[in-house]
Amino acid sequence: MVSVSNTLLHQSDALAHLTRETSSSELMLSEIANCIDCITTFGCLNISVSHICIDSRKVVPGSLFFAIGGCLTNGNFYIEEAIDHGAVCVISESPPPSHSPISYIQVADVRQALAEVSLLLYGKPDQDLSLIGITGTNGKTTVTMLTKHLIGDCARTSLLGTVHYDLGTRIIPSARTTPEVHDLCRLLSLAKANGCSRDYNH
């Protein structure tokens, strides 16, 4: 069981350190293009990826980079940096440039595409876990901890909250209250691999 809270994880150095341990599969770009709402594609789709990223500074060779817009900046501004760090494909809501040096997939909703690809890459761990989400203004952490301890006597559980991420066999500090979907899928995959059957999140 894995506990997921309303304030979930994003990625810190501690979370990024788990990337190599996470059980993710390799996906072909053609497979990705078929499972998301594509507007157009550019370049070769006969390329496999095993890592997805929304921060150009954390791109590693072979990454799929999602260019996501935000309140203060826009991921499209950092496509060149992502390419310099080894990205092999970009997924964005913006049209592909006329001379992109790498593959490019334009979608209607980049965040929806990120969610769909993340679930696919990490083997849809949410389908194999009993998930409990705890929301509210105050008391989420307390309720989550109590719930985990109550159910923990019957099954191995995981907890993803504002204080830390308990993955069943280890505890790491949480960096942010709300995680991006690819980090959440990665953590759920790790919890599942560690033998958890339930997850609590607040």
Language-model-derived ranges and their functions:
Residues M1-E116, L120:
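N-terminal leader/targeting and accessory segments in enzymes
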